[in-house]
């Protein structure tokens, strides 16, 4: 990478993309504390209420800030377009949430997001889901990339049914050094997207297993 391109790269992303990764919320803020496990099986016919955990809300804010810097950086003529586009693509703040909601919609009859628990319970859902997500992307001060997705399922009395999850973590080689070609840097940054998608696919498999197990248990009990 040319010195001029490297300087543009550092100038654009050092400040904005060095944004602090979201802090991990206390465990109690990301789950309900049931008295007992639920005997309610998960089924395709159920109506599901979704709540976002504190981790999910913090992660969304982090991704939106990161993405805004990436989009602004893409307008810098001194920055190779392959690099800037890789940052834009890998920081899409809607990718994970959109994927997770689609996954739930494939497995249940109705899926609705609510702002708070009271609103969710007033809708009388069959199942309540706490969606807990965490993402961390590469920055000048961080080379550890993470993507964690978890959905905890509870019955209408907030007793625990089970959970689906997917996660990936990887330490990336530094992209902030002179001598690397732009295609190599872009490819490294694009690995963030690959990591996120692999974690989401793992979540899908886990969710399908959980719902299938619930259906089998329901049939066996009849």
What are these regions (language model features)?
Residues 23-97, 209-222:
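A structural "domain/chain start" motif
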Residues 85-134:
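Short, solvent-exposed, polar/charged sequence segments at loop or secondary-structure edges
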Residues 52, 100-108, 112, 200, ...:
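Sec/Tat-exported extracytoplasmic proteins
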Residues 26-31, 116-163:
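Surface-exposed short loop/turn segments
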Residues 1-9:
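Bacterial N-terminal signal peptides that target proteins for export
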